[in-house]
Each structure stands twice: as structure tokens, then as C-alpha cells.
UniProtKB/Swiss-Prot annotation:
NCBIfam families according to UniProt: PRK13780.1, PTS_HPr_family
UniProt-annotated location(s): Cytoplasm
Keyword annotations from UniProtKB, A to Z: Cytoplasm, Phosphoprotein, Phosphotransferase system, Sugar transport, Transcription, Transcription regulation, Transport
One GO BP annotation of this record: phosphoenolpyruvate-dependent sugar phosphotransferase system
Location of the active site: 15 (pros-phosphohistidine intermediate)
GO CC, alphabetical: cytoplasm
Post-translational modification Phosphoserine, affected residues: 46
The species this protein was found in: Enterococcus faecalis (strain ATCC 700802 / V583)
Gene: ptsH
Quaternary structure (record): Monomer.
Name recorded for this polypeptide: Phosphocarrier protein HPr
Chief location: cytoplasm
Ranges for domain HPr: 1-88
Amino acid sequence: MEKKEFHIVAETGIHARPATLLVQTASKFNSDINLEYKGKSVNLKSIMGVMSLGVGQGSDVTITVDGADEAEGMAAIVETLQKEGLAE
């Protein structure tokens, strides 16, 4: 299992467009990928789950990836977060 914490820096947090990008990225992998915020964990492959968290700017989130392609999955998620200027 791979687990990393991120600090959300995007002014709008994880709203519809970045949530869609994260879900699309996560959906490419067979591993279980979860996003945790304020003690609640959701499947990062679910747009409704991600949007339900209401992650705003300045928030700290944890992403866990567990499965056969976990290293590749985490690398892709990190790349998406950084490329889109969402998190540090």
C-alpha cells in the first residue's frame, strides 16, 4: 500500500474540473485508490464521492493506493495534482 499526504493549494480546491481529472486518472488503474479528508474516505474513482468531500483550498488530504499497480497509480495521481497546480 502507498499512502501520501497533500496540501491543497488551488484557490477553488478540488471542484468539478479537477475532481474529474483525478477520477479519470484513478480509473486507469486496477488498484483501490481512496481520498481521505476530515476522517472520511471515498473512492477516488467516484466523482460523486470526491465532490461530496468538499475539499477546499488549504485542506490536507491523504491518498492511498493499494493493489498490483499501486506504484504507477500513485505516481499518476501525484503527477495530476502537481501538473494541475492542485496540491503540494
